[in-house]
Regions:
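Metal-dependent de-N-acetylase/amidase catalytic core
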Residues: 1-17, 97-101, 107-347
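Active-site rim/loop-helix segments in enzyme catalytic domains that contact anionic ligands
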Residues: 1-120, 142, 146-153, 157
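Surface-exposed, proline-enriched loop/turn segments that connect beta strands in immunoglobulin-like
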Residues: 349-353, 393-394
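Short, solvent-exposed loop/linker segments at the N-terminal edge
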Residues: 354-360
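Beta-strand-rich structural segments
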Residues: 361-369
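Proline-anchored loop/turn motifs at beta-strand termini and strand-loop-strand connectors
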Residues: 369-411, 416, 436
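Short strand-edge motifs at loop-to-beta-strand transitions and within beta-strands
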Residues: 417, 425-433
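Short glycine/proline/serine/threonine-rich loop/turn segments at secondary-structure transition edges
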Residues: 435-466
Length: 466
């Protein structure tokens, strides 16, 4: 199932961002149909973490509830296949109007947060959950709709937030802006209740499992069978897009070589050739995929990956900062992950303690299992540690691990002398990790600093925390 779902997203490049105000505002059915069904890269931007909501599962309110609801959103995205984003806005409670919301949230600062996400995620399409009018009810809902429309224009304007360019974040033109119709006559209908043979249920049913993750809001729902649709209104389009074309992605170049005109003629030919060979490998991998032998797809996928790497290298040399080079780099990483899954390679990292303190020590074991039928080469792990942390590899006695903390039935490392791992073999490495006395205590980045009014404070220009 996982292999098949991954393969769906490896041909072409479609990116969609949904924008709402709170956790549980998102249309999980649409997110699921796009991500799991169409292989699109999807994201949900919630302006807030739902800190002002109710709590049916515990006493936490305010920032504490925001922590819980953040986790619920992340759990929902694990199911529907999306990526989760936030702005710095704190959910202070109910507002009657957008004007009241913008009295609490500095409008320009909030818009900057949304534009930052548009320019870094770079969606082709935005779907706004709300209209930005009093029909949305809650003032924060109205504010979310207004922000979606304003950010659609601002993200493409180099005069808006020009300081982002110094951080490598360039303007981005979103091609289409839709909004949920909510009873209005929609211009586009997307099927969200289609049965998916890979999932064994419909996208809508999976979406309802995703929605049920919002436990603190008592959002548990059934998973009914039958057809379902989402109605959308086309709100705005970029120059050159025909608004009368009925397709959701109509008029948008969603191929892997979109933007290839940024390259010289020789580089274009090389990239086009590499992508054609990659797609052929991808097609053969899909044909070879079998539930009883998923590794049958590994060889054609590996051949396709080799061609993709060649195309990426050409694009990097010819136009290192181009959208094409970035797309090919991301796709190469995604195919590498898909290849490991198809080959039956499993990596497991286990520590002797889930909580450590500054000045403390912990043992970590890395286990690499080749569950497929092909030999794995260059099977050498590298621990990624925070600054100041150190790791020393320690010997594993032959036969150790047959009991005790690191599990039963595990023999000594079966790694070959040439660093390869035979089919069915397990390699193990154990490390003694030391934490420096001045190590920074871990915490939630959005609570590292005190709020400024109704806005969280965190490094606004660090995309790693968004």
């Amino acid at each position: 199932v996982g292999n098949g779902l991954q393969l769906r997203g490896l041909d072409g490049e479609k990116r969609v961002l949904m924008i709402g105000a709170h956790p549980d505002d998102e249309d999980t059915a649409l997110l699921t149909a796009l991500a799991r069904g169409m292989g699109a890269t999807t994201g949900y931007l919630s302006l807030t973490r739902g800190d002002g909501g109710q709590n049916h599962i515990g006493p936490e309110l305010g920032e504490g509830l925001g922590v819980i609801r953040t986790g619920e959103l992340l759990a929902a995205r694990e199911l529907d296949g999306g990526t989760q984003f936030f702005t710095r806005a704190f959910d202070y409670g109910f507002s009657k109007s957008a004007d009241e919301a913008f009295e609490k949230w500095p409008r320009e600062a909030l818009l900057r947060d949304v534009v930052w996400i548009l320019r870094t995620f770079r969606p082709h399409v935005i779907v706004s959950v709300f209209s930005g009018t009093p029909a949305d009810g809650h003032g924060q809902h109205q504010a979310a709709g207004i922000m979606a429309r304003e950010a659609f224009e601002a993200a493409a304007d180099p005069q808006r937030f020009p300081e982002m360019a110094a951080l490598g974040v360039e303007p981005w033109q979103v091609e289409k802006l839709y909004r949920r119709s909510w009873g209005d006559e929609g211009t586009h209908t997307l099927e969200t209740g289609r049965f998916d043979p890979l999932l064994g249920r419909s996208h809508f049913q999976l979406a309802m499992e995703s929605r049920s993750q919002h436990r603190s809001q008592d959002m548990g729902v059934a998973q009914p069978v039958g057809g379902r649709t989402t109605e959308l209104l086309l709100w705005e389009v970029a120059p050159g897009i025909d608004p009368t074309d009925p397709g959701f992605f109509a008029g948008i170049d969603t191929t892997l070589i979109a933007g290839i005109e940024a390259l010289d003629a020789a580089s274009r030919r090389a990239v086009e050739d590499g992508v054609v060979r990659y797609r052929n490998g991808l097609s053969r991998a899909a044909e070879a995929l079998s539930p009883s032998g998923p590794w049958e797809s590994a060889e054609p996928l590996a051949e396709g990956l080799s061609s993709l790497r060649e195309a990426e290298a050409v694009a990097r040399r010819a136009a290192p900062d181009s959208e094409l080079a970035q797309v090919l780099a991301r796709r190469t990483e995604a195919v590498e992950h898909a290849l490991l899954r198809a080959a039956g390679v499993t990596l497991k990292v286990v520590a002797t303690d889930d909580l450590v303190v500054p000045g403390g020590e912990v043992e970590v074991e890395v286990q690499l299992w080749n569950g497929g039928d092909s030999r794995v080469g260059n099977a050498v792990p590298r621990l990624s540690l925070p600054d100041g942390w150190t790791a020393e590899e320690i010997a594993i006695e032959e036969g150790a691990g047959g009991g005790g903390f690191f599990g039963r039935g595990v023999a000594g490392s079966q790694l070959g002398e040439d660093g390869s791992l035979a089919p069915g073999a397990l390699a193990r490495w154990r490390y003694h990790v030391r934490i420096p006395a001045d190590a920074q205590v871990s915490g939630l980045y959005f609570r590292d600093e005190a709020r400024d009014g109704e806005m969280y404070q965190w490094p606004a220009d660090d995309p790693g925390v968004w």
